[in-house]
Curated annotation (Swiss-Prot):
In plastids the minimal PEP RNA polymerase catalytic core is composed of four subunits: alpha, beta, beta', and beta''. When a (nuclear-encoded) sigma factor is associated with the core the holoenzyme is formed, which can initiate transcription. Gene3D superfamilies: 5' to 3' exonuclease, C-terminal subdomain, DNA-directed RNA polymerase, insert domain, RNA polymerase, RBP11-like subunit. SUPFAM superfamilies: C-terminal domain of RNA polymerase alpha subunit, Insert subdomain of RNA polymerase alpha subunit, RBP11-like subunits of RNA polymerase. Belongs to the RNA polymerase alpha chain family. It is an enzyme of class 2 (transferase). The gene is rpoA. It comes from the Eukaryota. Pfam families: RNA_pol_A_bac, RNA_pol_A_CTD, RNA_pol_L. This is DNA-directed RNA polymerase subunit alpha. Residues 264-366 are annotated as: Alpha C-terminal domain (alpha-CTD). DNA-dependent RNA polymerase catalyzes the transcription of DNA into RNA using the four ribonucleoside triphosphates as substrates. It comes from Oenothera elata subsp. hookeri. One of its GO terms (molecular function) is DNA binding. One of its GO terms (biological process) is DNA-templated transcription.
Length: 366
């Protein structure tokens, strides 16, 4: 039997932004191309990227508003042109950008007469408003308007529950999608035997992300989704009696650093804060949210403990391991005692560097 040769492209894939514009503060547009692709690949990538752009990217929204002494959502407030419902709809349209983890609070407290806009919202430092001119309400009389707000970072679309009213606060339908729309098209070229394709990808965003940032984040999310399949063999994943239960490997550096938790080093480890590890914001926030503040706290956790934390994945364990450079320490020519001392000394050196920076006027540690 004669096997047909499978033709594999040896050309390097390249992508380029061919058009970029800002139509308004809340509407950005970008057009990108990826080539050369073999027949069928453009559609595969285009469909996956569009779904990731529209459904996998996180955004920040106002999800709840609290008014004082308002009986129901369709009430009117004396001296305010809009009803409570209209104010809630205006708050829903506010576009925010943040590196927030979870939820936080904000507020509006103004005195009329005058127009209340997005710039009147008092926000935490981690959140910023894209368009300060967005309208919220019109105060026709010299009255005070105070609204408590809840801000959340999430993804997708959350519809408010009709029964989710808590002591004068009202839920708001939240659209966490920074990407307003995404389209892909395909251009084929070449002869019948060596047909190749160019993928065109169009992205519209609400201004909280640029199209290029959205493309980058969607790509990273897709990579994260496929990583378990890539590392299935090296991770030695196996199924137990319940075919849906997956047993993960042991926490790699938990055993190797057992000696670092000896009494003589415990004080040193408690003096090394995770702020000094230069962790990615998502991993750092996840550890902080679980009250892990020092290297000692981290090393006293098993992998099972870490995997129970919200948004924590097996790849994050690997990333922590890389940052700590444990593998490098355990494969060099030093003995175990020297490794321990070198490991701890390196962190105190970083700490000292950070203190010097503070003396020079910088706020953050290295």
């Amino acid at each position: 039997m004669v096997r047909e040769k499978v033709r594999v492209s040896t050309r390097t894939l390249q992508w380029k932004c061919v058009e970029s514009r800002v139509d308004s503060k809340r509407l950005y547009y970008g057009r990108f191309i990826l080539s050369p692709l073999m027949k069928g690949q453009a559609d595969t990538i285009g469909i996956a990227m569009r779904r990731a752009l529209l459904g996998e990217i996180e955004g920040t929204c106002i999800t709840r508003a609290k008014f004082e002494k308002i009986p129901h959502e369709y009430s009117t407030i004396v001296g305010i042109q809009e009803s409570v419902h209209e104010i809630l709809m205006n708050l829903k349209e506010i576009v925010l950008r943040s590196n927030l983890y979870g939820t936080c609070n904000a507020s509006i407290c103004v005195k009329g007469p005058g127009c209340v806009t997005a710039q009147d919202i008092l926000l935490p430092p981690s959140v910023e408003i894209i368009d300060n001119t967005q309208h919220i309400a019109s105060l026709m009389e010299p009255i005070h308007l105070c609204i408590g707000l809840q801000i959340e970072r999430n993804r997708g679309y959350h519809i408010k529950s009709p029964n989710n009213f808590q002591d004068g606060s009202y839920p708001i339908d939240a659209v966490f999608m920074p990407v307003r729309n995404a389209n892909h098209s395909i251009h084929s070229y070449g002869n019948q035997n060596e047909k190749q394709e160019i993928l065109f990808l169009e992205i519209w965003t609400n201004g909280s992300l640029t199209p290029k940032e959205a493309l980058h984040e969607a790509s990273r999310n897709l990579i994260d989704l496929f990583l378990p399949f890539l590392h299935a063999e090296e991770e030695n994943l196996h199924l137990g009696k319940n075919k849906y239960n997956v047993t993960f490997p042991l926490f790699t550096f938990h055993k190797k650093l057992a000696k670092l938790r000896k009494p003589k080093n415990e004080i040193a480890l408690k003096s090394i804060f995770i702020d000094q590890l230069e962790l990615p914001p998502r991993i750092y926030n996840s550890l902080k949210g679980s009250k892990i503040h020092t290297l000692s706290d981290l090393l006293n956790k098993s992998q099972e403990d870490l995997m129970k934390m919200k948004h924590f994945r097996i790849e994050d364990v690997k990333q922590i391991l890389d940052i700590l450079e444990i593998e490098k320490a355990f494969h060099n020519r030093f003995n175990e005692e020297n490794v321990e001392n070198a490991f701890i000394s390196s962190f105190f050196l970083n700490k000292t560097k950070g203190q010097k920076k503070d003396e020079m006027g910088f706020e953050s540690l290295e």
